[in-house]
A protein has these predicted regions:
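Catalytic strand-loop segment that frames the active site of acyl-thioester-processing enzymes
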Residues: 14-67, 184-197
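A generic structural signal for short beta-strands and their flanking turns/coil linkers
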Residues: 31-33, 48-50, 92-96, 108-110, ...
Length: 197
């Protein structure tokens, strides 16, 4: 499996850190996807984006010689998760809708891109595509998703001791006293007017 390595992102794109080393999609686990992502800057409409690349190997196949649909859906879910690097909140997948436009053969590289469509209170809406061979190649997969903001304690409760998230100890992040209200607000609302509760 290959991806956008931490040192070889596209020209002008900033490599993004992985979530944690044991992540099935972005960690370095045997049989995992080993995805890496980069920030190319905002799209033409000024919206935050992420990009990446994924080469399908034998552990990722469904039908003989083709990528499993669940593998491609997992890649899209992780791509959307990488968009969180643009935000001051953490989110979990609430809903993921994936469309398959063309088969993805083993050995083929899928070029991934995603954009934030909307942040509305706790809700984050995103969309993305996976294209064959080049970033402008034929569309093989597309997806939309709804993510929901959660406190870091959501992850601390289940994570093994010593787990790091984006390069920092999860236990420290989970006990942060910063208010989520500081980051999650309605359009036009002054975050200083929010009270903890």
């Amino acid at each position: 499996v290959t991806g956008v390595a931490e040192t070889d992102g596209p020209t002008g794109a900033t490599p993004l850190p992985r979530h944690h080393e044991n992540c099935f999609a972005c960690g370095d686990r045997p049989g995992g996807l080993r995805l890496r992502f980069a920030d190319p800057g905002p799209d033409a409409d000024g919206r935050p984006c992420v990009i990446g690349a994924f080469t399908v190997d034998a552990p990722h196949q469904g039908a003989p010689g083709l990528a499993h649909g669940g593998t491609l859906a997992a890649a899209m879910d992780e791509l959307f998760g990488a968009l969180q690097h643009h935000l001051d909140e953490v989110y979990v997948t609430g809903e993921l809708s994936t469309r398959f436009h063309a088969p993805v053969p083993l050995g083929e590289t899928l070029h991934l891109s995603a954009v934030i469509e909307e942040v509305d209170g706790r809700k984050l809406r995103v969309r993305g595509t996976g294209r064959l061979r080049t970033p402008d190649g034929p569309r093989a997969v597309s997806a939309t998703a709804l993510f929901l903001a959660v406190p870091m304690t959501h992850f601390v409760t289940h994570a093994p001791e010593g787990t790091e998230f984006r390069g920092r100890p999860l236990s420290v992040l989970g006990h942060s006293r910063e208010r989520r209200a500081r980051f999650v607000r309605s359009p036009g609302e002054d975050p200083q007017d929010r009270t903890e509760g």
